[in-house]
Every structure is written in C-alpha cells, then in structure tokens.
Amino acid sequence: MRQSSENSQNLYLYNTATRTKELFSASNAPVKLYTCGPTVYDYAHIGNFRTYVFEDLLKRTLLFFGYSVKHIMNITDVDDKTLAGACRKNISLEEYTAPFIQAFFEDIAELNILPADVYPHATHYIPQMIKAIQKLLDENIAYIGQDSSVYFSIKKFPTYGKLSQLKLQDLQCCSRVTSDEYDKENLSDFVLWKAYDEQRDGHIYWESPFGKGRPGWHLECSIMAMELLGSSIDIHAGGVDNIFPHHENEIAQSESLSHKPFSRYWLHSEHLLVDGKKMSKSLGNFFTLRNLLDRGFSGEEIRYLLLQSHYRMQLNFTEEGLLACRQALKRLRDFISRLENPYPESTTISDEIDQQGKTFLKAFSDSIANDLNIAAALAALFDFIHQTNSFIDKSKFTQADANYILDLLKKINTVLGILQFSATQEIPDEVMQLVEKREVARREKNWAQADAFRDQVASLGYLIEDSKSGPKVKKL
C-alpha cells in the first residue's frame, strides 16, 4: 500500500532470502523498515557509511514512489567492543559511547542521510530482552550453559541457515559461542545472555532471573525491531557481513518468539574496498568520515562516491575516485547555475524540452525501480544535461524551460540528495549594468571595451557566459 503519487510504479528489489529480484509490496502503510545501525565503540568508518548511504537510497526511493515509511535504526551501545572500551577507561558505558553517538549523528548529517524515525538504544530495552529470553527458556528453545550464560539452541529452529543458505544437517557444529561476531566455520548455539565476568566486564552488568550479565548483540536487534515495528516487518537491511551470523540469528530468535515470518524482504549492500584491498588499520587504509573531511573532501563528494555504484557490487574506494566525484559534482553545479540565470520570460515550455524532460524522468524512475540501479539513473541524468546544454546553446531557451528543468532536478534530488540549489540569484545592479555596457560594446564591435567590461565583472566575482539566447551571469 502507498500514498497517491504521480511517481507510482512497480519497484523491484533483490531479496537475499530468495536470491531473486522480487516485486515489492508493503503489507500495510507505512512500510516497516529496520536497518542495522552503528556499534558505538569508535567512530564509524567509510565501509559503514557505504551501507548507511545505500539504506538512505532505499528509503528515499520508497518515498519517491509514494510509500510512507517508518524507519527504525538501532544504536548498539552494549556489546563486546563497547563494554571492553568502557572497562579499559574505567568509565560508565553511557560516558564511553556518548561521544561516538554524537559523532554518528554529525556524520550522517554531513552525508545528507535522512534521519530515521527512531534510534533505539539497546540499553533502553534490557527489560524486554530479559522477558524474551525467559520465554525462550520456558519453551526449551534456549538453555543455561555451564558458564551460566543463556544460549539459543539452533537445533530447535529447523530452518536455521535459510537466509545464509546453510544446511544445518551438513555442518559440524561447535557446542556454543559467546562472541558477538563469528564466522560460518564456528556455527554453534549462540549467546542470548552473557553471564557477568568481573575481570572482563568490570562494573557493567544487569540483573536478571538467570543472573548478572548483559544481552547478546543478536537479541538486541530482534527485540528493538519487534517492539517498535511489530512481529513482522517489511524490509530489514544491512551489509553483507550481517547476513551471518547476525541476521540469521535475528530470524531464529524473532520467529521462535512470534511464530511469524520476521521480515518479508532482506537487502544487503556489498563490501567497500580501499585501493582494491579490505579496509584495515594495519594496512593504513582505514578511513573515518572525519579523516576524509580533514583532507579537504566534502560530505557531498563522499556521498556521491558511496552512492554511485550499485549496492550489490563491491565498491573500490580510491582518492582518484573521490577527485572524479568532485568533477562530476562540479558539472552538476555548473548546470544548475546555468539554469538559475535569468532567461527571456515565456508562459509555455518548448516542446523539445518538455519531451526531453519526460524521457529523462522515465529513464531515471525505471532505473531506480530496477533494484535501485543508481548507476543507470546517474547516466540518464548526465545524458539529459548534455541534451539540455546543447538546446540552450543553439535555441531560444526561456525562463519557463529553465523552471521546468529545475523542478525536475529538485524532484530527482529527493532520491539522490547530492544537488544544491540557490535561492533566487540576485545579481547586483552594478554587475548587470556592466553586462549591458558590454553588450552595447559587442554590438558596436568594440571588442577591447567589451573585454574590459568583462574583466570588471570578473573583478566583482561574477562570470559572463555568452550563448545564443544572450549573456548569462553566474557567481565565480
């Protein structure tokens, strides 16, 4: 179900659960979207932001096609890493994570990522997690191990492995695993409640019927999603590294608790590489957003780089790529600046511009409707820019044409989030008078004087661009 929209059309998304591209349909309005948020033990790195920008594109596309969206993104403020950091500094978990939470919100604003409706903190849902664990214990789906931690018995969930396409009966399972993160070779019963260890956990723990401790990472997302979106959601998204074990374990827990399908669609973005290699602090190719901003790149340029490739393709992050994005954005800014100049007034849009605009909007919409094919959408945009620039150069371009194209660009920017538009540009009278004097000199073929007026305009911070429809003025 969706709200009425002139952009309504079929949207196809690749569902990791079925390994196929499927027609998207929401169960009810609004679309229930849950995305895995940051683990706030450190500053988020650009690999994280590749996933967050993909999720932003997904959300913006849903909105573009007329869907209302309820978006939940969790804040993991208790796990192995956050707890270790707080204990190392001998401060509370809240004190340790607060700066990184604040930095995360600053970073997503820098990247023009639309905010979620709710950012639940895992530590705010501990009572609900304890209640869920008790239910799983009561139903013999979970058990208390010899180490006093509570574990989920994956053999009690016959379809375990369906998301990551693991066949439980074909695998040698370890007895259990307490770490939040592990690989398929260590497939095992996973921890729901990690028993308190004073040497490891210091002063950080919660009381529960099964003893002191803290919840497992996988349970946190299940409970926050179900508490805020209900037992069944429409879309769950994250990075490919979340498929196993995190999302696999979420399904097992959630469906054991509700006896309903947890999520109808699962979407995952591919890895980000740096100079063709996996990002690693030891290789010196580990970047936070702040590292790149300090090196002179803008949030807009970084967003463009993270956005421009299809989300299911690995993205190779290079400085050369960022510089290329800078040039692409300059081309976009120059085009918008050209459109924002004054043109001869007209009440009608030219037939050619009208047709080009409709063709472009269809190509753009069809591209993003095809599993968020942003590369094809951007190609359509640059083709349209080329066509429009050619039309402006050779034809009588009017204010109605310019306004029509600017409206189109503003519409597609609700998806892209990379274009910047000026308020109505006010060219100072002094500049416009010099432009008029230059035109008089040009008509009189007094080229030296015309060049002098052009230089005076430049000294005031403006550039004159000559076209068949007359001179255009833009700020340098």
UniProtKB/Swiss-Prot annotation:
<keyword id="KW-0436">Ligase</keyword>
<feature type="short sequence motif" description="'KMSKS' region">
    <location>
        <begin position="278"/>
        <end position="282"/>
    </location>
</feature>
<dbReference type="GO" id="GO:0008270">
    <property type="term" value="F:zinc ion binding"/>
</dbReference>
<feature type="short sequence motif" description="'HIGH' region">
    <location>
        <begin position="38"/>
        <end position="48"/>
    </location>
</feature>
<dbReference type="Pfam" id="PF09190">
    <property type="entry name" value="DALR_2"/>
</dbReference>
<dbReference type="Pfam" id="PF23493">
    <property type="entry name" value="CysS_C"/>
</dbReference>
<dbReference type="InterPro" id="IPR024909">
    <property type="entry name" value="Cys-tRNA/MSH_ligase"/>
</dbReference>
<dbReference type="GO" id="GO:0006423">
    <property type="term" value="P:cysteinyl-tRNA aminoacylation"/>
</dbReference>
<dbReference type="GO" id="GO:0005524">
    <property type="term" value="F:ATP binding"/>
</dbReference>
<protein>
    <recommendedName>
        <fullName>Cysteine--tRNA ligase</fullName>
        <ecNumber>6.1.1.16</ecNumber>
    </recommendedName>
</protein>
<keyword id="KW-0862">Zinc</keyword>
<feature type="binding site">
    <location>
        <position position="281"/>
    </location>
    <ligand>
        <name>ATP</name>
    </ligand>
</feature>
<dbReference type="InterPro" id="IPR056411">
    <property type="entry name" value="CysS_C"/>
</dbReference>
<dbReference type="Pfam" id="PF01406">
    <property type="entry name" value="tRNA-synt_1e"/>
</dbReference>
<dbReference type="InterPro" id="IPR009080">
    <property type="entry name" value="tRNAsynth_Ia_anticodon-bd"/>
</dbReference>
<keyword id="KW-0067">ATP-binding</keyword>
<comment type="subunit">
    <text>Monomer.</text>
</comment>
<keyword id="KW-0648">Protein biosynthesis</keyword>
<dbReference type="InterPro" id="IPR032678">
    <property type="entry name" value="tRNA-synt_1_cat_dom"/>
</dbReference>
<dbReference type="InterPro" id="IPR014729">
    <property type="entry name" value="Rossmann-like_a/b/a_fold"/>
</dbReference>
<keyword id="KW-0547">Nucleotide-binding</keyword>
<feature type="binding site">
    <location>
        <position position="250"/>
    </location>
    <ligand>
        <name>Zn(2+)</name>
    </ligand>
</feature>
<dbReference type="InterPro" id="IPR015273">
    <property type="entry name" value="Cys-tRNA-synt_Ia_DALR"/>
</dbReference>
<dbReference type="InterPro" id="IPR015803">
    <property type="entry name" value="Cys-tRNA-ligase"/>
</dbReference>
<dbReference type="GO" id="GO:0005829">
    <property type="term" value="C:cytosol"/>
</dbReference>
<feature type="binding site">
    <location>
        <position position="246"/>
    </location>
    <ligand>
        <name>Zn(2+)</name>
    </ligand>
</feature>
<keyword id="KW-0963">Cytoplasm</keyword>
<feature type="binding site">
    <location>
        <position position="36"/>
    </location>
    <ligand>
        <name>Zn(2+)</name>
    </ligand>
</feature>
<feature type="binding site">
    <location>
        <position position="221"/>
    </location>
    <ligand>
        <name>Zn(2+)</name>
    </ligand>
</feature>
<keyword id="KW-0479">Metal-binding</keyword>
<comment type="similarity">
    <text>Belongs to the class-I aminoacyl-tRNA synthetase family.</text>
</comment>
<keyword id="KW-0030">Aminoacyl-tRNA synthetase</keyword>
<dbReference type="GO" id="GO:0004817">
    <property type="term" value="F:cysteine-tRNA ligase activity"/>
</dbReference>
